[in-house]
Amino acid sequence: MQKSITSFFKKKSDATDSPSPPKKVPKIDAKTELPDEPHIKSESASPETKPKVEPMSVDSEEKTSPVKNVKKEPKEVDDKTTDKKVTTIGLNSTAATKEDVENYDPSADSYHPLKNAYWKDKKVTPYLALARTFQVIEETKGRLKMIDTLSNFFCSVMLVSPEDLVPSVYLSINQLAPAYEGLELGVAETTLMKAICKATGRNLAHIKSQTQLTGDLGIVAEQSRVSQRMMFQPAPLNVRDVFRKLREIAKLSGQSKMDLVYNMFVACRSSEARFFIRSLIGKLRIGIAEQSLLTALAIGLVKKNHIDDCKASKVPDVYKDEIVDTTLLLKTAYCQCPNYDIIIPAILKYDIKELQERCPMHPGMPLRPMLAQPTKGVHEVFERFGGMQITCEWKYDGERAQIHRNEKGEISIFSRNSENNTAKYPDLIARSTALLKGDVKSYIIDSEIVAWDVERKQILPFQVLSTRKRKNVDIEEIKVQVCVYIFDLLYINGTALVTKNLSERRKLLLEHFQEVEGEWKFATALDTNDIDEVQQFLEESIKGNCEGLMVKTLDEEATYEIAKRSRNWLKLKKDYLSNVGDSLDLVVIGGYKGKGRRTGTYGGFLLACYDTENEEYQSICKIGTGFTDEDLQTHSEFLGKHVTSAAKSYYRYDPSLEPDHWFEPVQVWEVKCADLSLSPIHRAAIGIVDGERGISLRFPRFIRIRDDKNSENATDANQVAHMYQSQDQVKNNQKSSTQMEMEDEFY
């Protein structure tokens, strides 16, 4: 955190990445009619850059204009710095000129959050200002610069039109509400193409061919809209209305949805069309994920609080510690209260130090779960915990579940990635009162749901649980019975417990809840500091159809660390006694056509880890083993629905690995391997262990689909680097190198 935030105070050149060579895009005749879902492989695609979009050719004799970029004035040079010249509006001005609008660029070093907010006289944020911000961010290579640009826009909104901050934030991460509410757009591309045709007079085949060429319906929509002449220009869009209309669209269906999409698209100008269409598709494609947005929001808040001391958009060094503290407080608050409708009004009204008090955790709003670090053996556990008091719990092979009850007695069930699974488990809700002991009005418990054999009274494999219906579950038709194993209590009767140690939380859990055979059980646990007892308990857990053990501290460093993969929880699985300490959860980003017996399906796949710092997917291996014929058929049918015409701009890979088809990052697989090694081809964790090489898996083998994880919850680059460095052969080499360095230094 310290490193990434303080980097904002370095020179601009330090915060940006070097440009990559342009991507070659195959030319396609715009008048050639393509099938509804064609898959065209891009030529010599470079994974590091976004495609350069050429001006569209037009049906008949109509001419089109290329997409307008944000206009930039010639640079002015003085003795100290070179900077963009940005038109500023005087503090007493009453109206923005056309030049003010066209030159709006929150990435400029001379940008002033108040003076350059050209909408300040109307107090309503134009959607075009947000769209231009997105456009600049999309064209920016450096992540820190992207965050700084967004922070400038947020600061302007805070100062000029604070009521627009909530919709601006949601639109920046392409959400319409907190994630746990499940309100999503996801309008089909075919529907949007028809709306674009209706609004612009374009031919549907032409729109399809251009979308195939660019891989981006948003770009096609913008170019179609820019080239269109209109007798009467609709009133300009503003952020508040666009957000409200998008929420309406999400709740509508049929022709009424189509009509509203059409009416909104007709009102779009310039880059508004691009990002409006992308929002409807559900892929904004600007590279801003939630953690980056929270950082931008924190920096924007500090700029706003010290606007009189800021020279343009630059924050004086004296406030850099405040930025670090504000970012940490904001991210911590969001972990326990993931709702911008609550957080943003609080940061605008109260001091940031009051944020956690103003945004408390409460039932019905999921927390980001605490996660465990993998270990390779019992000895490593005792090396980590030393003389601390520890407890070992069986690690159940099921689905993580955070179960909430509010004061009204309403039950909510959330997955590890905050997805609302309440409708999936009506049977658990029906029997939830039997769990209670004593006066319990509200609670949040952390648990694991497993498939349960009622007759044999034993746990069934995860694969059985995965066959259970996810939606529209009728309690009378449930075939897979479940049992809940509870291992933590986070909230009870209005009191948050996350700052208490595990011993206290467990005591309260046993006081207020009780087991019900085959329905509700406490995790089987053993408190011990004896290494032989831990080894024996591990073997017992495996016989009990579990994955292994979770080892936790009881008193020291034993608070519940929300949203953190903590070294105070260690997982010890039966597979850990091999060279690699853990399986990996990887994202499928590409597929290779099968040959021989596998003809007609994909025979192999390209997998990637997720780099949370750079918000990109980095290739880590090609995989073709561990699949049954049925697996390959299932994967091919599912992934075939998510093929894209080119690699995403946030995929990092070597061109030699290019698959036959690229996929959207929609599915996570659990994978085992023999070991990890440095690779000149794969890009996983590149720059962490080695400056020029990434890390790859040797002999990867498919284990299962992880439906409980989304792509951004996949194994991240830092975890991959840690797993590589934890291997015995790597540690031995490091020791040898260190010894040689010491000897060289001595002599």
Swiss-Prot record:
This is DNA ligase 1. Transmembrane segments: none annotated. Its EC number is 6.5.1.1. It is an enzyme of class 6 (ligase). It comes from Drosophila melanogaster. CDD domains: Adenylation_DNA_ligase_I_Euk (cd07900), OBF_DNA_ligase_I (cd07969). Its main location: nucleus. The active site is at K395 (n6-amp-lysine intermediate). The modification Phosphoserine is found at S18, S20, S42, S44, S46, S60, S65. Residues 1-84, 725-747 are annotated as: Disordered. One of its GO terms (biological process) is lagging strand elongation. DNA ligase that seals nicks in double-stranded DNA during DNA replication, DNA recombination and DNA repair. It comes from the Eukaryota. Residues 725-740 have a biased composition (Polar residues). Keywords: ATP-binding, Cell cycle, Cell division, DNA damage, DNA recombination, DNA repair, DNA replication, Ligase, Nucleotide-binding, Nucleus, Phosphoprotein. It is found in: Nucleus. GO terms for cellular component: cytoplasm; nucleus. The keyword Signal does not apply.
